[in-house]
A protein has these predicted regions:
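Noncatalytic scaffold domains of N-terminal-nucleophile
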Residues: 1-5, 17-18, 22-186, 190-192, ...
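Extended, domain-scale alpha-helical bundle/helix-rich regions
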Residues: 238, 245-251, 258, 262-265
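Short helix-capping/linker segments at secondary-structure and domain boundaries
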Residues: 106-111, 185-187, 256-264, 285-289
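Generic recognition of well-ordered alpha-helical segments
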Residues: 6, 100, 178, 251, ...
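Long, structured ligand/cofactor-binding scaffold of large enzymes
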Residues: 9-11
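Internal maturation/activation junctions in enzymes
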Residues: 260-310
């Protein structure tokens, strides 16, 4: 509810949907840090109803420039397990969400930039009530030892050595300070500053350090990419192009329509949807990737004739 309230507040002040989305996401980074936050990335698909134009901003994380194909290999020649790799610095990409915020706000925002940060800053300083969702995550992470091993996460999620629980009041003054800096100076306060130095230090810390550099952060930019559209019955589905999986949505819709007919019952429709997902995801995993690095046969994959071949 905190994020929704922040978004509504922005809309009531005359902000755009983009303004509201940024404000909501900043709050989510506080109240649901396991799912959102400044250390990640995102995609934004924006529709301008006045011009009927769609634009796509790619603010996803990028691999550090020094990333190598064998970076997840251990010294003994074996590949790191999922649970070894995910908490390590090797799995951390150069964060893009702050650049996405700024790019989107410059293009589609209306309210002053600092105003978007107010609710998140106030909640960080004054505290928010821990939700069952966050408490459950901490419970699960505790079983894996993922929070208590890191001094900073232990301090935050185990104040006074007591694990947080649903209903507790939790404050995050460090997050408030970071947001204040970005609100005052813009994205440069995140990508070319002491904050950037702290990010690099954390990512490259033992026991499984990554290889992110200050140059990776300084050089990061959100990217405008094409919007892709495809037919579905008498409608048109428009979504995000690679590196997102938006194209798979169009493929799923087309495949689903090929697998059912007017006489299909609910069970058959569910089965068709599952099969459509399975087939589309197989192609996604095989063909999709970073369009700056690989050639993706997207036009062929989205061709309705391709669906008929199944």
């Amino acid at each position: 509810p905190y994020a929704v309230k922040a978004a509504i507040s922005i809309l009531e002040k005359g902000g755009t949907a983009t303004d509201a989305a940024i404000a909501a996401h900043l709050v989510l980074g506080l109240v649901e840090p396991q799912s959102s936050g400044l250390g990640g990335g995102g995609f934004m698909l924006n529709y301008d109803f006045k011009t009927n134009n769609l634009t796509f901003i790619d603010g996803r994380e990028t691999a550090p420039a020094s990333a190598k194909i064998d970076m997840f290999m251990k010294d003994d020649g074996n590949v790191m397990s999922f649970m070894e790799a995910v908490p390590s610095g090797k799995a951390v990409g150069t964060p893009g969400i702050v650049a996405l915020y700024e790019t989107a706000h410059k293009a589609y925002g209306l309210l002053p930039w600092p105003m978007l940060f107010e609710d998140a800053i106030n909640l960080s300083k004054n505290g928010f009530i821990v939700s069952p969702r966050l408490a459950n995550y901490v419970e699960l992470a505790e079983k894996r030892g993922r929070l208590s091993k890191n001094p900073l996460t232990k301090k935050y999620f185990y104040p006074n050595d007591v694990k947080i629980k649903s209903g507790d009041l939790l404050k995050n003054p460090e997050y408030a300070n970071t947001l204040k800096a970005i609100a005052k100076e813009g994205a440069i306060a995140f990508y070319n500053s002491n904050i950037a130095k702290e990010i690099v230090s954390a990512v490259n810390a033992d026991p499984h350090p990554g290889e992110m550099t200050l140059v990776d952060l300084k050089n990061y930019n959100a990217v405008l990419r094409p919007v892709i559209c495809g037919p579905f019955r008498n409608m048109k589905i428009c979504t995000t192009s690679p590196p997102s999986s938006g194209g798979a949505q169009i493929m799923i819709a087309g495949l689903y329509d090929q697998l059912i007919n007017n006489e299909s019952n609910e069970s058959e429709k569910i089965s068709a949807f599952v099969d459509a997902q399975r087939l589309a995801y197989a192609d996604r995993d095989h063909f999709f990737g970073d369009p700056d690095e690989v050639n993706i046969p997207l036009e062929a994959l989205l061709d309705p004739k391709y669906n008929l071949s199944w």
